[in-house]
């Protein structure tokens, strides 16, 4: 008799995705981050659901309701900090997951990669509207500054900004709609993640060598389920260490001051995971140029398959490209640091150089280096 997991319409889908899935036998720990992102999403949806039970999306009571959650709700403080630091974990996993895709040439799976870029944009949008909800100083001014960037769009810009605000400034209408967006977007992310997996399972996973692994595959369960559980335990260990010892390490102290439209904070900056993009935005003196640079910094990922000139898929056997990849990582860390600094000398020039280098590496140096490596191998 055939096992029910192979015949039942629903269980068959789960079986083919997580149990009997043929997986390459040599995928390393860098392949753990897909499952970790799934866990992060589930964790964020669950903690967010419990927070939404006590939160009020009104400018008069939003800040107080978050304080109430932390002080009066049973275990409210841990739910709130798991949600806030869970977002940081989400982005750490996201950046590593994208970096893995760049390093090992996973972007040659076009549909999977493009859905992934859409997912990245959606998660960034969700995190942005979520940061506005506690209605602290940085929430209010962050929302004002970032939504204002849309006014750079010619002709319709100003009308568009006021339409998003629901008035002439960031106010009650803005907070209410941002809460609605923040509630619905994670479910859209979950749906997109399923499409992401669907396309991935059409081709099968990539592996560190970048060559087809059809000849040497193993069942996903028990080998990779055990490996994923180890990754999940380490993720929870890291997250709970943050939550229980230094819950405010990655937050901004200004957000513990209730929003005040009459008092601008000295340094307006987003959460740490947006600082690299914020630094690129600030490095262009022109408003429209800055907005275009900001969007391009993420949208450039869609061009990766077109910019791939190497005869090899993975970087594992390409030392020159490896060096360039790690320079890119260092450059992104530099941009993250610059994004958190005030707009003054020498930070302005460092930010501009780092921004130029970011686009230069991806658009020019990587394709040229790949071609040089092809010639060195006489291909």
Swiss-Prot record:
Function: Component of the ubiquinol-cytochrome c reductase complex (complex III or cytochrome b-c1 complex) that is part of the mitochondrial respiratory chain. The b-c1 complex mediates electron transfer from ubiquinol to cytochrome c. Contributes to the generation of a proton gradient across the mitochondrial membrane that is then used for ATP synthesis.
Residues given in the record as a ubiquinone binding sites: 201
Bilayer disposition of the protein: Multi-pass membrane protein
GO molecular function: metal ion binding; ubiquinol-cytochrome-c reductase activity
One GO cellular component term: mitochondrial inner membrane
UniProt-listed InterPro entries: Cyt_b/b6_C, Cyt_b/b6_C_sf, Cyt_b/b6_N, Cytb/b6-like_sf, Cytochrome_b, Cytochrome_b_C_euk/bac, Cytochrome_b_N_euk/bac, Di-haem_cyt_TM
Cofactor annotation comment: Binds 2 heme b groups non-covalently.
Keywords for the protein's UniProt record, in alphabetical order: Electron transport, Heme, Iron, Membrane, Metal-binding, Mitochondrion, Mitochondrion inner membrane, Respiratory chain, Transmembrane, Transmembrane helix, Transport, Ubiquinone
Binding site for heme b b566: 97, 196
Protein name as catalogued: Cytochrome b
Coiled coil: none
Localization in the cell: Mitochondrion inner membrane
Residue ranges of the TM segments: 33-53, 77-98, 113-133, 178-198, 226-246, 288-308, 320-340, 347-367
Cofactor(s) of this protein: heme b
């Amino acid at each position: 008799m055939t096992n029910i997991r192979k015949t039942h319409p629903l269980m068959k889908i789960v079986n083919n995705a997580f149990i009997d899935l043929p997986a390459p036998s040599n995928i390393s720990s860098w392949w753990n981050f897909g499952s970790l992102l799934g866990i992060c999403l589930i964790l964020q949806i669950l903690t967010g659901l419990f927070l939404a039970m006590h939160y009020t999306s009104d400018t008069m009571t939003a800040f107080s309701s978050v304080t109430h959650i932390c002080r009066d709700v049973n275990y409210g403080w841990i739910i709130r900090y798991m949600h806030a630091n869970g977002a940081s974990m989400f982005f750490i996993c996201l950046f590593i997951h994208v970096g893995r895709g760049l390093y090992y040439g996973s972007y040659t799976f076009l549909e999977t990669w493009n859905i992934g870029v859409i997912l990245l944009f959606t998660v960034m949008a969700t995190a942005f509207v979520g940061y506005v909800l506690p209605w602290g100083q940085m929430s209010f001014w962050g929302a004002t500054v970032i939504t204002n960037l849309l006014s750079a769009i010619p002709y319709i810009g100003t009308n568009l900004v006021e339409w998003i605000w629901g008035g002439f400034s960031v106010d009650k209408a803005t907070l209410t709609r941002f809460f609605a967006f923040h509630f619905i977007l994670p479910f859209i992310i979950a749906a997109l993640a399923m499409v992401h997996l669907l396309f991935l399972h059409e081709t099968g996973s990539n592996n560190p060598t970048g060559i087809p692994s059809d000849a040497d595959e193993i069942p996903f369960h028990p080998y990779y389920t055990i490996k994923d559980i180890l990754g999940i335990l380490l993720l929870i260990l890291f997250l709970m260490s943050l939550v229980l010892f230094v819950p405010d390490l990655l937050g901004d102290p200004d957000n513990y001051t209730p929003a005040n439209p009459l008092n601008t904070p000295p340094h307006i900056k987003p959460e740490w995971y947006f600082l690299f993009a914020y630094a690129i935005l600030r490095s262009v003196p022109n408003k429209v140029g800055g907005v275009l640079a900001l969007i391009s910094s993420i949208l450039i990922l869609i061009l990766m398959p077109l910019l791939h000139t190497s005869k090899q898929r993975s970087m594992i056997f390409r030392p020159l490209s490896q060096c360039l990849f790690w320079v890119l990582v260092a450059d992104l860390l530099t941009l993250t640091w610059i994004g958190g600094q005030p707009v003054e000398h020498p930070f302005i020039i460092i930010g501009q150089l780092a921004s130029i280098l970011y686009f230069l590496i991806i658009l020019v140096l990587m394709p040229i280096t790949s071609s040089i490596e092809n010639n060195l191998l006489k291909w």
